[in-house]
Amino acid sequence: MSNLFFVILLAVGFGVWKVLDYFQLPNTFSILLLILTALSGVLWCYHRFVVLPKRHRQVARAEQRSGKTLSEEEKAKIEPISEASEFLSSLFPVLAVVFLVRSFLFEPFQIPSGSMESTLRVGDFLVVNKYAYGVKDPIFQNTIIAGEKPQRGDVIVFKAPQQALIRTGLGATRAAFAENLALSSKDNMSGVDYIKRIVGKGGDRVIFDVEQKTLKVVYGKEGKPCEIDCETKAFEYTQNPTNPAFPNELELTEKGDVTHNVLISEYRRYSDLEFFPQEGMQTAEWLVPEGQYFVMGDHRDHSDDSRFWGFVPEKNIVGKATYIWMSLEKEANEWPTGFRFERFFTAIK
């Protein structure tokens, strides 16, 4: 029976992995981890409540018949247990803890690209707080326990909307895709994790100055666009000394809802066709729908973000990036060459 569970565990795990990989479903790892945890849990229960009691009874009978205490080697020959299945069942407590922590508390995340430099660098390993905005189920991302709402300036990890994955620089194409998707599907969620900073939330009007590359946000009221007595936040910028890590970029301190550094490429120019168009709004202006968020990367001219593909539904948000626990000295798509010890255990601002 134990060997049968072992075969079932391997077969189901492999089959589910192939199916999820084929359909490119969101939360693939969470689904697979849940299944493996459940199967190992069944195997653990079978060992704990069926196999071991039966073995103890057989050993007791054998000792009673022989009139002596059996050695461990002699006991092992009575009702032998498959080492493979015993090992897999022993993984259940570990898998259960990993599943619970990763699903509801914290999840590790690695920075694969430079879209958030210089705040986050390629090779940084982060801890993402998954209960900062409430507790969600790990499969469908439905809220189980409500928490605080994401705020402007928060650095968040989220499931990229489908239109963000279209390999094009034309915002109009992505907008058309997003509209068609909205008509055919309730959810707009891919299996790809992005990390960006929230610039605007529901009701906010975000204005990006294409020439100066500066931001202005007209705050909404309770998720709705403001009509009168509106509060407007014009972000302030001061230039920093040249950062040796980014000698070809201009590093600025941006003072908005939070104060942090951004990188600008002086020679990057934008075309109106690049931006995500919104009906009734001028180019490079967006009115954030209620329950959604406008996000941008801190590496402003090397970030594929809401300016080009639109908004992030609240349901897509995985959690809040809180701190860097380790950092490797590396570039994108290259092997690491060392450690950035000065970045270990630093808070993300």
From Swiss-Prot:
Gene Ontology molecular functions: serine-type endopeptidase activity
Signal peptide: none
Intrachain disulfide bonds: none
Localization annotation: Cell inner membrane
One Gene Ontology cellular component: plasma membrane
Pfam family membership, one: Peptidase_S26
Record GO biological process: signal peptide processing
Annotated InterPro entries: LexA/Signal_pep-like_sf (IPR036286), Pept_S26A_signal_pept_1 (IPR000223), Pept_S26A_signal_pept_1_CS (IPR019758), Pept_S26A_signal_pept_1_Lys-AS (IPR019757), Pept_S26A_signal_pept_1_Ser-AS (IPR019756), Peptidase_S26 (IPR019533)
Record SUPFAM superfamilies: LexA/Signal peptidase
Catalytic activity annotation: Cleavage of hydrophobic, N-terminal signal or leader sequences from secreted and periplasmic proteins
Membrane side Periplasmic: residue ranges: 102-349
Catalytic residues in the record: 115, 196
Protein family membership: Belongs to the peptidase S26 family.
Protein name: Signal peptidase I
